[in-house]
Every structure is written in C-alpha cells, then in structure tokens.
C-alpha cells in the first residue's frame, strides 16, 4: 500500500476503535439501538477491496473478543463471543471464537463482491447502486451469520437466556438490529466510499 492508502486505512481503523469501545458506536432509534461497528468494515471493503475489508472485519472481531473477555465478561451472553467469560450458568468454547470472528471477516468480503457483481450484471459504469446493495448485504452477512452460528453452537443456552422461541428470536434480532443497521450502512457507506475514492 502507498502512504495515502495506509493513512486512509488507519483512519478507518481508528473510527472502528471508537465505535467498538465508546457509546458513539450506538444510535438509539426509539426503542431500538443500532450499532455502527459494521460501517467501517463495509467502507473498507468497498474502498480498498477484499483483503482490507476482511482485515477490518477481523479487527472488529478482535475488538468484540476483547470487549466480552475483559470489559463485560460477566454479562449473561458474553460466553457467546469468548471462551473466557465468567458467566456462572454457561461457558464459552471454540464456537465462541467462530461466532466472534467468522461473520465479521466474511462481512468484510461480501460488500465488494456483491457490489462488483451488481455493477457488472446491470451493465452500469456507475458503481454507486452496487455499493448500496453491497452495503446492505455486508451488514446482513454479519447479522445473519452471528445469529445463525449462535443457534448452531449455543442454541439451547441462548433460547434459555432470552426465554423466547427460535422464530421470535430471529424476528426480534432482524427488526431491532439487522434492518436498522443495514439501512444505516446503505445510507452512509456509499457516500463515504465515493468521497474516499476521490481523495
């Protein structure tokens, strides 16, 4: 990477750090709280490609691991994201690391792949619409995979904690997190990406 690209990537990593460890990473929308942690990951993917996008996704996963291991280890669902939680009822395992890292890394891959495919299939040189679609898919990749892997590795434990059936959990998660975060990514990311490409 040249110096300009390196500085841009460092700036995005700094934003990701702020979003993951401060209240600035959460936007209250009525009773819903949408997180912004996926925004830098999607921006990195669309601006710099698969490699940097997956790197930012890995950093997001690392920050999540650090948060649940050292900052909130006693939270009832901390075991879902770290094998080192202090939750009395349940303990994490290798599945916790899969949940913590794999969805975030793949969420750094899908935006640029989908954007490129959409742009080519529509025979449109304007990549803005492709970036919008890629942003939505990237955000939903994280939401769907995190929830799906939680149900694979800790389905019974998670359902016990939230005291709801699987369909209710899916619906609540998509409505409270998936849709608002996808909308935020679709609105913010393409605009920021276009600006970064022109710098």
Map each language-model feature to its residues.
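Loop-helix junctions at membrane interfaces
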Residues: 1-199
């Amino acid at each position: 990477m040249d110096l300009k690209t390196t500085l841009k990537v460092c700036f995005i990593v700094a934003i990701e750090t702020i979003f993951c460890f401060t209240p600035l990473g959460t936007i209250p929308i009525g009773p819903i709280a949408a997180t912004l942690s996926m925004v830098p990951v999607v921006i990195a993917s669309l601006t710099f490609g698969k490699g940097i996008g997956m790197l930012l996704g890995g950093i997001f996963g690392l920050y999540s691991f650090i948060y649940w291991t050292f900052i909130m280890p006693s939270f009832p669902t901390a075991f879902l994201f770290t094998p080192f939680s202090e939750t009395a009822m349940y303990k994490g395992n290798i599945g916790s690391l899969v949940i913590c890292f794999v969805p975030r890394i793949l969420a750094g891959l899908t935006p640029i792949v989908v954007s490129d495919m959409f742009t080519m299939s529509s025979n449109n040189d304007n990549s803005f619409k492709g970036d919008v679609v890629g942003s939505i898919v990237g955000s939903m990749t994280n939401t769907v995979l995190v929830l799906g892997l939680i149900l694979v590795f800790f389905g019974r434990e998670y359902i016990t904690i939230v005291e709801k059936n699987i369909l209710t959990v899916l619906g609540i998660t998509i409505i409270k997190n998936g849709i608002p975060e996808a909308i935020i990514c679709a609105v913010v990311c393409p605009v920021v990406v276009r600006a970064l490409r022109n710098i």
